[in-house]
Amino acid sequence: MKTTEAGKDAVKLLKKQNLVPVPDAPFPSFYNALSNKVYIDSSLNPADIAVNLAGTARQLHHKQVLTKLDMAEMKAADGVQCYRLMQADAEAHKALMYYALKSNEALPYSPEMPGGISVHSVIIQKAMGASDEKALDAAVKAFYNDHQAVQTCDLLYARNQHLTAYNIDRNPSLAPGAKLFSKDMPDKIFEKICSVGGVPYVKQEDFNKTPFKIMFQNRRNDIARMVAPFSKDTSIMKMPTFEKVEAANAAARALATKNR
């Protein structure tokens, strides 16, 4: 896979949408599911628009992989993990597009560096000669080191899923037969989320480790309370918490000091 292939994949997805320029928009670019349109801040330079559209195109890809109903029916723990990964994938693609444009000195415009950890991971990986696949894989995994970004994902998951579940619960005709927060995540879904042209660039089993599942306890409890009116699903309570892991680490350090 080359950067041009990732770009072509993004263009295919964006071609199907109505792109709406908005001067001084509150976001560089974003997809509105209700209007099925992509809004772009037309005051940005073309390079910055391209970087942000790379991330928005991934949102459209995710929409094809997991529908809103799929997310509503997925058990909370699995839903949280998918939601995080989708954001990580979008950030990784923005970072790769930034690197490609920044590296091309012939372009008349230069993009601003995106925020977050992912872009630094891409720059380091590409400087070491890594392929685009490896750079994307590393960028996705680096995203999880930004605990504030991950916690924001968890907050957005809770808000969005509560609204969806509430609407379906009040109006069953919106999704006849839907069983909220009841299903396990589909097989190999991580590899489908993180794929370009149908080719995955991550391995699902890499994300079974604690660093990719850990949560703040208060956010975990908030999600459990959100799910309770709609389902008996308690999967979220099995997710490890920073507080518990830190307590275990502190106990281990104390024991090591005592045994010196």
Positions of PLM-derived features:
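Auxiliary, metal-adjacent structural segments of Zn-dependent hydrolase domains
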Residues: M1-V38, S42-P46
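Structured segments of extracytoplasmic/periplasmic soluble domains
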Residues: T4, L60-Q64, H93-N104, D146
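Active-site-adjacent bridging/hinge elements
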Residues: P28-N32, H61-D70
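Soluble non-cytosolic domains of exported or imported proteins
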Residues: S43-N52, A77-L85
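Active-site recognition of the HExxH zinc-binding catalytic motif
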Residues: A50-V65
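Substrate-binding clefts and substrate-entry loops adjacent to catalytic sites
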Residues: L66-V80
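Post-HExxH zinc-binding segment in Zn-dependent metallohydrolases
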Residues: A76-H120
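Pan-zinc metallopeptidase signature
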Residues: Q125-R260
